[in-house]
Amino acid sequence: MLARRFYKEVSVRDLGGVSGHTALVAGCGGWCGPYHDMVKHVPTIEAKFERVIIMPSSFDVSVPSVRSTLATTKALVFARERKSFDDICRLCDAKIAYDCAFFFDYRPYLRHGDGCLVSYRTDVESVLSVIPESNHDISKSCSSLDEWLWTIARHAVVRTDRAHVMIAAALLGKVVDYWTSSYHKVPAIADYALRSFPVRRIEPENQFRIAS
C-alpha cells in the first residue's frame, strides 16, 4: 500500500513536531478494557493531520472512553471483524477489512512442524484462571518477529488466545485451537476471516486436559 510513497514512521508516544496530510494509525488491540491507550492518542493525531485512517482493529465499545472517542472522531476507522464493525458503524465512519497480518508474506516460514505450541496470554487480558505449565507466551518472550514466526513454524498444532498467534499459525498451515481473551476479539476474527482454515474454538477444560 505504501510502495513508492514517501512516509515517516513515528510512535504515538513521540508526536512532538510531527504533522502532515494523512496519518495511518496502525491496527492494534488498544481499544479494549485492559488496554485502551489509543483513546488518548487519536485526538492528538487528529489535531496534527488533515486526514486520519485507523487501520483494522478490534473495538470494545462497552468501554466508555472507547465509545466516546469513536463517537467524536473524524477518522476513517477500519474494523477487522464483524462484531466490532457492527458496534462502531453507528458511531463513526467505519469500514471492515482483514487484519493487516493477513497481507504478510509467510512463504519463507512455511514448514511441516511437529508437536504442539501452547501460547496463551500471561497479561491482564487473559481470562484463564490457570496457565498450563508448558505455556510459552511468545508475544512476550520472543525478541524479534523472525523468532516469533519460526517458533510457530516448527510446530504442527498451536493453542492460543492471542489474535496474531492464531492468524499467523493458520496462515502457516497449522491446526489452531483458540480460546477467547477478555473481549470478543479472537473468536470474532476467527469467525470473520478464518472459516476456511483448520481453526476451532475449544473450551478451557479441554485445553488443560489436552495440554497436560
Language-model region placement:
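Active-site anion-handling motifs in enzyme catalytic cores
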Residues: 1-212
